[in-house]
Amino acid sequence: TLKGEVPDLTNCEVLGPNNNLKFEGNVSVESNVLFDLRKGPVLISDGAEIQSNTRIDGPAYIGEKTQIRSAQIRSGTSIGHHCKIGGEVECSIISSYSNKAHDGFLGHSYVGEWVNIGAGTSNSDLKNTYGAIKMNVGNVEVNTASNKIGCFISDYVKTSIGCFIYTGKRIGVASHIHGYVTEDVPSFTIHAKSLTGKSFELHKNSAIETQKRIMKRRNRNQTSYEKDLLNQVFEMTQDERYIAGVLKTDFSM
């Protein structure tokens, strides 16, 4: 059971049973926030900040010290701790220390830790035909039997501004994506095919240095374990990049 001080909701609106709104610790809720509890509970953890003009539809979870920036949080969304979230998020899991601070749509998707989703990035979670979405899993095409599947974004991924990700696409660890993403992206790849026709390998030393920088911004010290893990993933995914035709040259536009 979550127990905490209930913030002042005088200038907010609550739809549905009040006991479906739970606060843990001290939560900041600004004016003009709407909580829709008719489909399920909304749970908000200690230190979270809900800014004005936000709508949160239950069931939903907002993690510790996460900031919701005038966003639309739709049903079925779970957001980890120390995240910054804006735009629209629907039926998605966003892991801790990941940012989607700007406008853009994220739906029926999974986002790993330490991800940064650039301004205007959006994903598709529905085909134009409304048919079942097919995915490539282990070089085998799989019919998911679902018409609502977004994208799967691994740890440490960075998306550029104005990036568009098609249905059912997987983005590998530490990759950078630009423009339109119409195919799966291997780990440690700078994917810019819609802009340059090419994808380039992201050197593991660059990924490790970026890891160090982003952790420092969150007052975290990079550990030898975390560096070693990136090293190992880089080695384990070399065949993926080779099969995908990723170039071992410096990225250029």
Give, region by region, the residue ranges found by the protein language model.
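Active-site-adjacent structural elements in folded domains
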Residues: F35-D36, A48-T54, R69, T77-K84, ...
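Membrane-embedded translocation segments of transport machinery
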Residues: Y61, Q67-R69
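Glycine-rich hexapeptide-repeat left-handed beta-helix
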Residues: S70-A71, H82-L247
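Extended, small-residue-rich solenoid/repeat segments and analogous flexible loops
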Residues: T1-Y61
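Glycine-rich beta-solenoid repeat tracts in large extracellular/virion proteins
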Residues: L34-L37, R55-D57, I73-R74, S122-N123, ...
